[in-house]
Amino acid sequence: PDYVPRSGQPGKDVVWVPTQQVLIERMFEMARLTKDDYLIDLGSGDGRTVISAAKRGVRALGIEYNPDLVTLSKRTAEAEGVTDKARFVEGDIFETNFSDATVLTLFLLPELNLKLRPTILNMKPGTRVVSNTFMMDDWEPDETAVVADNCSSYCRAYHWVVPAKVAGTWRLGDGELKLAQSFQKLSGTLTVAGKAQPISDARMKGGEISFMAGGRSYTGRVDNDRMNGSSDIGRASRRRSVESLLGTAS
């Protein structure tokens, strides 16, 4: 007889509870999922998240420890006609490389999220991570959503964007930008012409940096050890390129 999984059945690290379809769709919306993405689902269960992504034309991979669930997922993908986009591998999420994902989905317990967190934070800046129900300890989400309709349990999702690592001193044209970083949140000082200004409202979103200093709004993009950006002058809508935010890390 065909294998039929049971909600709540024990697994290697967590019991298996399927993510409800309405929440899957909301998670995709939060991640701004497109056909250019490569989605990896950690602990893919019966394959529904991966198959849902594949139906949108997205390449997707499910990593699942239970071989019966992997077989079921492959069979479902074939029945749905998405084997060209949906793949499933039997493996341990803590031992399988998922670093090439542009979107990562998970429905794991908080302690497992925390165990995965260092690996996730080392992924490419801009990688989107969406979790059903459970958070990443003190790494606060960039976005939270609750689905009220057609969802009976586990109806909350959290979305993070992996931030670029920018802590340290950046040399600017005639000064420097000193940054301390806690995940996507930043603090520090901008020194121009010998005058230090504390920065505020400072944060990363992937490789994009934004902060206020001295009444000006700065935005930039970080690419490894270089930062390119611009500044709003006061409240004017006019923007100008500022060489002072063309920085290099030191």
Regions found by a protein language model. Give the residues of each.
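Conserved class I S-adenosyl-L-methionine
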Residues: 36-45
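Conserved SAM-binding loop of SAM-dependent methyltransferases across substrates and taxa
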Residues: 46-58
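Conserved SAM-binding motif I beta-strand of class I
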Residues: 59-64
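A short SAM/SAH-binding and catalytic strip from SAM-dependent methyltransferases
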Residues: 98-115
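C-terminal substrate-binding/active-site "lid" region of AdoMet-derived donor-dependent transferases
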Residues: 113-165
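Central antiparallel beta-sheet cores of small beta-barrel/beta-sandwich binding domains
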Residues: 164-232
